Every structure is written in C-alpha cells, then in structure tokens.
Regions:
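Membrane-proximal intracellular helices of multi-pass ion channels
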Residues: 1-205
Length: 205
C-alpha cells in the first residue's frame, strides 16, 4: 500500500476544500454576516495543512486500485469532517453530529437535513449547504485528476474508485482531458439552469 501517495492526495483535497470554503465566506461578507469569519478560519486551516502535506512529493506516486479506494474513502471523510466545522462554529447547529450529518448529506447529494426550517440559517451557511451538493454532484477527486501530475494508470485507478459502476469510460484518450470536459459540461449546465431560474423570477441567491 502506497500510503505516502494517499497522504499526498488527501493534502490536495484539503487545499481544494480550503479554497471552496472561501466562497461562503465571500457570500457572508457581501451580506455583512459576522458568522462568515468561521468559514475563513477553517479555510485557512485546510489550506495550511494541505500546503504542509504537499511540500514533499512522494518518490512513488503510482496508484493501484486499492490505493484509489483508500484515497476515495479517506477524501470523503476528510471533506466531511472539515466541511462540517463551520456549521458548528457558527452555532447554527445544536451538535457536531448534526453538522456532520448535514455536510455528509450535501457531499453525497442525499439532500436530507436535520433542520425543520433551513431558512433560519445565515446566507453563508445556506450557500455552503447548497454548494456541497454541487461539489458532490461531480466529485472532488475528478477535479483532482485535472491538477495533480500522476501517471495514466494512477489516474484511471483513482477514477475507478470514485466512479459508480464496474467500469469507467473515457471521452478522449487522456483521462485528464476527460475530467476537464466533464467539468466544462457541468459548469455549462449550471449556468443554463441559473439563467432559467432567473428568467422564472427567482432571485440569484
């Protein structure tokens, strides 16, 4: 088992989550919500831990299927643990278990919630809840395939572990390019749906 390569992947996952946590912080700033500072704090922690973990690239970055499975499971656990921290730090969820359930529900696109009225949350938290569903729709590890330099076999094993079904199809010969195409389509569909909702009279938020 290549644990150093798995640790390297997890460090990148933390950096990405730190960057993503800046979005709800910005939303909170726009709505002048003091609670949004917790999103910035957790974002900084994630980025610092991620940078420390990627300072030394492992000599062997080869990924086999078992490493892919471990990296996938550990990545989703890491995302959920750190992603739920702002929810409990803002004081909007009664317990960490509830906050963790909420974020796991988001990243897995389950849609379940422990709250009877989500509208009582601040704008930053409302955005983060919705954003986790959007992130989970494609998968963070698919995004990693576009930015982490790995061998083709390692990319495929990581993709196999992340994707449902017994096999993974590629739109183009290079898996990195496939991930890029998938995200372009995903972004495009998101923009189209936002425009349609705006035309239907819904506010941007």
């Amino acid at each position: 088992m290549n644990y150093s390569a798995v640790k390297y992947i997890l460090s990148y996952v933390l950096m990405i989550e730190g960057a993503l946590l800046l979005f709800p912080f910005i939303v909170g700033v726009l709505y002048m919500e003091q609670k949004s500072v917790w999103y910035l704090l957790v974002a900084v922690i994630c980025i610092v831990l991620g940078v420390l973990g990627t300072r030394h690239k492992p000599k062997n970055t080869m990924f086999y299927f078992k490493e892919g499975c471990l990296a996938t499971a550990a990545s989703w656990i890491t995302l959920s643990i750190f992603g739920s921290l702002p929810l409990i730090l803002t004081g909007e969820y009664p317990s960490y278990v509830d906050a963790l359930f909420e974020i796991v529900s988001g990243f897995t696109t389950t849609g379940a919630t422990v709250l009877s009225d989500v509208e009582c949350l601040c704008h930053a938290t409302l955005f983060w809840r919705a954003f986790t569903h959007w992130i989970g729709g494609m998968g963070v590890l698919v995004f990693l395939l576009m930015i982490i330099p790995m061998s083709g076999g390692s990319n495929m094993n990581l993709m196999r572990a992340e994707s449902p079904g017994p096999s993974v199809g590629k739109l183009v010969p290079h898996l990195k390019s496939t991930a890029q195409i998938l995200y372009v389509i995903y972004f495009g569909m998101t923009v189209v749906q936002v425009i349609l909702l705006l035309l239907g009279g819904m506010s941007l938020f």
